[in-house]
């Protein structure tokens, strides 16, 4: 009974003790930096810039977090994001007009990312390749595809797409707001749904989860 309560508690709590300590340390470091470098650090422009840069790594960390909670690891995350960005940039550069081009670029990027994730999942779940080895090989594949698509040169969007990244709502960068929204949605999924509980259980013990009737693949 105690073991069951302990497991349920560990599943439902969003942060363990180590995570809380890490958050406290980061907050203290930010506070100290803000005091010692107040003129350079604590200004609106710098905070907005940090928010924009945090979005990119934050979104990747959300996906990586779910992967690690399930007991795996994904070394190809950065290269998948790179391939998605190149794909979106090429769509925008293809002279697709107006907002339709931006929407199409976003859809293509999401589809490319989903296909890469499905391929990684196939390697791990159905071919039984260890996650580290599978994603170590797939990141080379994604990097090669990115180089071929970009022809080894920089792919950048035009001003239409840059407008979105420069938009702010009450001084908060729009990309950072989207990141917060994704964080809230993923938190609710992982803590309030059966899917989230299954991910935690599979990450804790995949074999026991399989015997419990959970499809670990």
Describe the role of every protein-language-model region.
Residues 184-217:
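Membrane-helix/interface signature in polytopic inner-membrane proteins
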Residues 20-24, 50, 58, 79-83, ...:
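Hydrophobic alpha-helical transmembrane segments
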Residues 2-61, 96-104:
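Membrane-interfacial amphipathic/re-entrant helices at transmembrane-helix boundaries
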Residues 96-138:
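Alpha-helical transmembrane segments within multi-pass membrane transporters and channels
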């Amino acid at each position: 009974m105690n073991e069951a309560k302990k497991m349920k508690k560990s599943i439902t709590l969003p942060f363990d003790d180590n995570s809380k300590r890490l958050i406290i340390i980061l907050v203290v470091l930010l506070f100290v930096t803000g005091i010692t470098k107040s003129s350079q650090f604590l200004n609106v422009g710098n905070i907005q810039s940090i928010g924009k840069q945090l979005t990119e790594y934050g979104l990747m960390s959300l996906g990586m977090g779910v992967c690690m909670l399930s007991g795996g690891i994904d070394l190809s995350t950065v290269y998948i994001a790179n391939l998605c960005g190149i794909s979106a940039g090429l769509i925008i550069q293809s002279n697709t007009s107006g907002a339709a081009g931006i929407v199409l670029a976003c859809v293509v990027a999401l589809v490319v990312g989903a296909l890469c994730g499905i391929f990684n999942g196939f390697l791990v779940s159905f071919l039984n390749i260890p996650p580290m080895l599978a994603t170590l090989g797939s990141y080379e594949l994604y990097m090669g595809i990115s180089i071929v698509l970009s022809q080894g040169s920089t792919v950048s969007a035009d001003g239409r797409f840059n407008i979105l990244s420069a938009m702010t709502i009450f001084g908060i960068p729009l990309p950072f707001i989207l990141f917060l929204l994704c964080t809230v949605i993923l938190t609710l999924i992982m803590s309030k749904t059966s899917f989230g509980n299954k991910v935690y259980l599979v990450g804790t013990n995949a074999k026991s989860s399989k015997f419990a009737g959970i499809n670990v693949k």
